[in-house]
């Protein structure tokens, strides 16, 4: 179920402060965040944000197409390595 329109999009306050500061001084260093639930805002376009995936911070360059999505959508938490082959079938 999507978020109510009367509430508006969510962004973590500390992340918003970091973004505003980086935009103000035109800083290009990646911003480190653990807030995967924050929505990408238009003023983030052009910044690099390192989003935590549970193990590492994954750097993500924000583009216009990402606006409105959550940061966690771009930092995958699970790796799929495929199913292992059956050893009995493999020997034939």
Curated annotation (Swiss-Prot):
PROSITE patterns: RIBOSOMAL_S19 (PS00323)
Keyword DNA repair part of the UniProt annotation: no
InterPro entries attached to this UniProt entry: Ribosomal_uS19, Ribosomal_uS19_bac-type, Ribosomal_uS19_CS, Ribosomal_uS19_SF
Keywords of this entry: Ribonucleoprotein, Ribosomal protein, RNA-binding, rRNA-binding
GO molecular function, one term: rRNA binding
An annotated GO cellular component: cytoplasm
Gene Ontology terms describing biological process: ribosomal small subunit assembly; translation
Gene3D superfamilies named among the record's database cross-references: 30s Ribosomal Protein S19, Chain A (3.30.860.10)
Pfam family, one: Ribosomal_S19
Family: Belongs to the universal ribosomal protein uS19 family.
Purpose: Protein S19 forms a complex with S13 that binds strongly to the 16S ribosomal RNA.
Name of the protein described by the UniProt record: Small ribosomal subunit protein uS19
Organism: Buchnera aphidicola subsp. Schizaphis graminum (strain Sg)
